[in-house]
A protein has these predicted regions:
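Short, well-ordered beta-to-alpha junction loops that form the rim of enzyme active sites
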Residues: 27, 100-102, 142, 158, ...
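Short, conserved beta-strand element in jelly-roll/cupin
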Residues: 126-148, 228-231, 260-263
Length: 276
């Protein structure tokens, strides 16, 4: 049997290894994303009384959309392109079809200026299963259009490489997974990170300081990136990508999904051993 041609180029993989994320436009059909968006609006109306054509009903909802998370229509996300990305980044045969594509994120617009948050920066997975190579992904899917300042998740480009680098220096019997000490060590490892995460007074212009250019920390270039895209676009991130929720100052709600933990079979085995 002939081997499957790679979906990603060597430059794509190099970019992922450097920055910890890769944007893939039109990863699944726009029409399928828009069909899912219609179902989300139906659930918002039926469960929360929020109607698309009546902005007076728009408000933040508690939790996530429950029916949307289970919706069979999401099967359309696993296209040949998406399979190819998984194979190229994780290895063919190393992963299984996900049961779902993660949490359903809806953020309605609110008034005010757009500011870069200083709190709630975090990552969702421990470093341990990924110390020698990437064995999982943090996957973002765009169900609706998300423009700049429109509530798109903020990621810290380069952070997975820095976190893994720091974790490798710690003796195996002293690694603590996702506990508070691990997070605090990362946040306080450089003045730039201390200011980003609100542990020190912020610079006058947080956007310019943290988003307009890279700052090198321990040999790793870091920069805050706002995830924007069109329905059907996806972003494939390293599982220890540092990220943060962003305010929505745009004209429409943010509709995205995030699969926080998409792990290979090997990663699941390693994680069980680490947690035992």
């Amino acid at each position: 049997m002939e081997s499957q041609a790679p979906t990603l180029t060597p430059a794509d993989i190099q970019r992922f290894e450097r920055d910890g994320y890769l944007v893939v436009r039109e990863a699944f059909p726009r029409a399928d994303a828009l069909a899912m968006q219609e179902r989300w609006w139906s659930e918002l109306a039926g469960t929360h009384g929020i109607r698309r054509d009546d902005r007076s009903t728009w408000r933040q909802i508690p939790g996530n959309l429950k029916a949307a998370k289970r919706d069979p229509a999401q099967a359309a996300i696993l296209t040949g392109t998406v399979r190819g990305v998984f194979d190229d980044l994780l290895g063919a045969g190393s992963w299984s079809r996900p049961r779902d594509w993660g949490v359903t994120l809806v953020t309605f617009p609110e008034p005010g200026g757009w500011e870069l948050p200083s709190r709630l920066w975090h990552w969702d997975n421990p470093c341990e299963p990924h110390l020698d190579r990437t064995r999982g992904l943090f996957v973002v899917s765009f169900i609706g259009p998300v423009a700049p300042r429109g509530g798109g998740t903020l990621i810290l480009s380069g952070s997975p490489r820095l976190l893994i680098k720091q974790e490798r220096r710690i003796p195996a019997d002293q690694r603590r997974g996702l506990d508070g000490r691990t997070r605090e060590r990362f946040y306080r490892s450089h003045p730039w990170l201390i200011a980003l995460t609100g542990l020190a007074p912020s610079p006058a212009d947080r956007i310019a300081t943290f988003m307009d250019g890279e700052t090198v920390v321990d040999g790793v270039p870091l920069r805050v990136v706002e995830l924007t895209g069109e329905p059907g676009d996806m972003v494939f991130c390293h599982p220890v990508m540092v990220h943060c929720r962003a305010p929505n100052r745009g004209p429409r709600p943010r509709f995205m999904r995030i699969k926080q933990q998409f792990l290979t079979h090997e990663a699941r085995t390693l994680l069980r051993g680490f947690l035992a």
